Swiss-Prot record:
Swiss-Prot/TrEMBL catalytic activity: [protein]-peptidylproline (omega=180) = [protein]-peptidylproline (omega=0)
Name this polypeptide is given: FK506-binding protein 1B
A Pfam cross-reference name: FKBP_C
Functional note: PPIases accelerate the folding of proteins. It catalyzes the cis-trans isomerization of proline imidic peptide bonds in oligopeptides.
Protein source organism: Emericella nidulans (strain FGSC A4 / ATCC 38163 / CBS 112.46 / NRRL 194 / M139) (Aspergillus nidulans)
Any one Gene Ontology molecular-function term assigned to this protein's record: peptidyl-prolyl cis-trans isomerase activity
Family classification: Belongs to the FKBP-type PPIase family. FKBP1 subfamily.
């Protein structure tokens, strides 16, 4: 159960089209993470079991492009602009790879992240 290689972004709500984060910038993002499930279908964005969410904790605040989060997160969020809402579909080599994340993400799992950048 793995999506196509790399990171694919599906825009649900466009951002302002100009303010994208750069390597080393701090971003603040609301998100929900799901395991990729090819039985769910394209209309459901292949969202399988939820493994994490910022809901109830507040948005994630992190530096982007410096290896503090998975590679697919870095790549996908750097493609977003301020105020954008998107689905990031991430292959396992851009996620947690062969090691997975014990107890949450099996080895070699693709991921689907629902991400929302603040409106600014």
């Amino acid at each position: 159960m793995n999506p196509p290689q790399g990171v694919t972004k599906t825009i649900l709500r466009p951002g302002n089209g100009r303010d994208s984060p750069h390597t080393g910038d701090t971003v603040i993002i609301d998100y929900t993470g799901y395991l990729y499930d090819d039985t769910r279908g394209e209309n459901e964005y292949f969202m399988g079991t939820q493994f994490d969410t910022s809901q109830g904790r507040g948005p994630l605040k992190t530096e982007i492009g410096v290896g503090k989060v998975i590679l697919g997160w870095d790549k996908g969020v750097q493609q977003m602009t301020l105020g954008e809402k998107a689905i990031l579909t991430i292959s396992s080599d851009n996620g947690y790879g062969k090691r997975g994340f014990p107890g949450l993400i099996p080895p070699d799992s693709g991921l689907v992240l629902y991400v929302c950048s603040p409106a600014g």
